[in-house]
């Protein structure tokens, strides 16, 4: 099945909506949702009078909602009212994430009363729109978990909105900052070799449409994750292979075929991303049958994949590892890489050196969207929380940070994120990502080096 293009994911998500409502609800690739545009319009005068821009603009600049040129254009206006009007003119053109980022910036600059005003207006607007067909809920921008049963999902309120901590506009707007020659020269000797062109092969396996007795629901927003990762890995210099909607047996067979590709011999690393429903230790095929993750890792270990021996192998798993929704807890007030320890040595047999041996599994790092026993959260419009955070951090920090440290930053973003869906079990829900590693050196991706 061909991957949906980044420019068509929005149309794909909304094709089942009622015809009378279609014009208002379909998103442009880099356009603001009509609900959000109308919310800003209805509060335009109050915002123009009350916005405090000095710190707010810096937050929006940091989130890539505005550019340096836009900030200068705004500040060139005479008077705070005119400056506020200029910002309000720009915001609707700054992508589907601009509204959420604006609300977050209001909160961060102690203008939460304006955020509350916007969210109240937004909730009222959504009540006015015609209800969706009972068979489809593809337009609802609320968080759902990766193991949420279909009957439960259909009961969710149509006026739910999720705050996003992601600051990008999606795959079309992703840009990876290049590594500088100076950084490469000071770090490459202690890191894994990553110089090949391409850097390696990457596989993105995305299951979205499910059949079988399990009655697993359509992974709305899964196509966004798919497009995001394909774009990200290409920008990082990988040759990307795509698989969509595979049964458990097909996943096993095609992962094995991928692991045995001759190109691994002449490239320096490998990436495997698995996006599906799941349980602890396994992911679902579209037929409702499970593929054990240990079987996946085994396909790429030193015994079964000699072409990748001593080369870093990255795995990213976007799937539930249980069905418990993390409700979170209230926060209380307050707030080397080691060398080998050596091995036992015998005085006998010094004449003949033994062949170097490797542990069966090494040089792997695996990022999980959630902890054991818990559900992974996915926004039905913007995709999974984890993939959003992964794309944000890797695009911004691959230039000067190794993969393990980047995954720590991903953890921090996920930790701070909170579901916003009043009236549902997902309101104020939490998620915590994690990673495990058998890497033996720092893994820098060195994007853009050496220059072509």
Swiss-Prot record:
Keyword Thylakoid on entry: no
Residue numbers spanned by region Disordered: 327-354
Active site: 277, 320
GO MF assignments: cysteine-type endopeptidase activity; enzyme binding; identical protein binding; protein domain specific binding
Residue intervals of the CARD domain: 32-121
Source species, domain of life: Eukaryota
Keyword Phosphoprotein: yes
Modified residues (N-acetylalanine): 2
Gene Ontology cellular-component annotations: cytoplasm; cytosol; endopeptidase complex; nucleolus; nucleus
Consequence when changing residue 57 to F: Loss of interaction with CRADD
Propeptide: 2-169, 326-333
Pfam family, one: Peptidase_C14
Record-level GO BP terms: apoptotic process; apoptotic signaling pathway; cellular response to mechanical stimulus; DNA damage response; DNA damage response, signal transduction by p53 class mediator; ectopic germ cell programmed cell death; execution phase of apoptosis; extrinsic apoptotic signaling pathway in absence of ligand
Outcome (variant: residue 104 to A): No effect on interaction with CRADD
Tissue: Expressed at higher levels in the embryonic lung, liver and kidney than in the heart and brain. In adults, higher level expression is seen in the placenta, lung, kidney, and pancreas than in the heart, brain, liver and skeletal muscle.
Consequence the record notes for mutating residue 95 to R: Loss of interaction with CRADD
Phosphoserine: residues carrying this PTM: 157, 340
Enzyme Commission (EC) number: 3.4.22.55
Subunit composition and interactions: Heterotetramer that consists of two anti-parallel arranged heterodimers, each one formed by a p18 subunit and a p12 subunit. Forms a complex named the PIDDosome with PIDD1 and CRADD. Interacts with NOL3 (via CARD domain); inhibits CASP2 activity in a phosphorylation-dependent manner.
Functional note: Is a regulator of the cascade of caspases responsible for apoptosis execution. Might function by either activating some proteins required for cell death or inactivating proteins necessary for cell survival. Associates with PIDD1 and CRADD to form the PIDDosome, a complex that activates CASP2 and triggers apoptosis in response to genotoxic stress.
Record: disease: Intellectual developmental disorder, autosomal recessive 80, with variant lissencephaly: An autosomal recessive disorder characterized by global developmental delay, mildly to moderately impaired intellectual development, attention deficit-hyperactivity disorder, hypotonia, seizure, poor social skills, and autistic traits. Brain imaging shows fronto-temporal lissencephaly and pachygyria.
Domain remark text: The CARD domain mediates a direct interaction with CRADD.
UniProt-recorded name of the protein: Caspase-2
Organism: Homo sapiens (Human)
Gene behind the chain: CASP2
